[in-house]
């Protein structure tokens, strides 16, 4: 039985090395691996011994904590319906007939899967050990992230077929009550966050030991709130990039006409509130200085940006009859002229107007995952753990620590 257990754990660790946000499982035997310190000798006393004090039972470990998530499996967490303008129909030729009536439509972001979600964390690790069996630990450090998904996941919308004209100067303009009426799903949205403070707390216990085998459990909670550093929208009809984007929180359509301009007011910095909890159960087996382990975990992560709406950057006043770089799309018709005395009422009908997107809430698409790793212990004082996680995420973890 012992040979079988050794073979399974060794094969799992070696076989996973080629298959490589974010919480590691950790070695279940970690509380009892480092039994000696660099400053104070370890003490393996009996908790029932009346001569034993808490000073003998408690020890401290410090180290480096690095967690690198290459792909977290996420999906949007939104309502089934989305309020915007009516869908253009075949009867709309030169311009859309109705662009001011708010209509509940099927939400294109509902149940969408993110194409890529990455998170990289570097932190200091501190653990308080009790009786060489229990750990209470925390991490303090910094994290940064990257998200990429189909534009439908971000509710990228705009107004096409606007036929409102300004009679005073015969130049077509967008009315204050105009609503976006088309959803752009054949595009990609990606965002990068800045490096923000991150922390986590947790506890780990060696529940059962038999010879060199250890069964343990752990629970962890992590939190961070990075700001969005850069937002890229890769769309043929409306392509733009925003550095340090700002938007509207709790604002329904229509957005203010100043949205996207330098004079926009009541906007907030776009940030993502990340929360995650995780419970895990793992089994390890010590082979001299190596202690491989395998574990399962249950976790729930959420990324909430308060559904902030971010408008496409544009000029407050037209220059050369344009406010954005959005292309003119004539289709089967002709390009309308929106200037001069002979201006037509649909001068903006061939160009996408009032483009915006929103950062929807996201959550874990899968709750269960697998973790495989190994710990190398030297002189019972120093340890380095390497771990990989699969199924609900593709991630790697490195932890190096020493005991005082």
UniProtKB/Swiss-Prot annotation:
It is found in: Cell outer membrane. Residues 89-103 have a biased composition (Low complexity). Residues 1-22 form the signal peptide. It is a multi-pass membrane protein. Residues 85-110 are annotated as: Disordered. GO terms for cellular component: cell outer membrane; pore complex. It comes from the Bacteria. The keyword Transport applies. Keywords: Cell outer membrane, Cell shape, Disulfide bond, Ion transport, Membrane, Porin, Signal, Transmembrane, Transmembrane beta strand, Transport. One of its GO terms (biological process) is monoatomic ion transport. Its main location: membrane. GO terms for molecular function: porin activity; structural molecule activity. Part of a disulfide cross-linked outer membrane complex (COMC) composed of the major outer membrane porin (MOMP), the small cysteine-rich protein (OmcA) and the large cysteine-rich periplasmic protein (OmcB). In elementary bodies (EBs, the infectious stage, which is able to survive outside the host cell) provides the structural integrity of the outer envelope through disulfide cross-links with the small cysteine-rich protein and the large cysteine-rich periplasmic protein. It has been described in publications as the Sarkosyl-insoluble COMC (Chlamydia outer membrane complex), and serves as the functional equivalent of peptidoglycan. Belongs to the chlamydial porin (CP) (TC 1.B.2) family. This is Major outer membrane porin. It comes from Chlamydia muridarum. The lineage of its organism: Bacteria, Pseudomonadati, Chlamydiota, Chlamydiia, Chlamydiales. The gene is ompA.
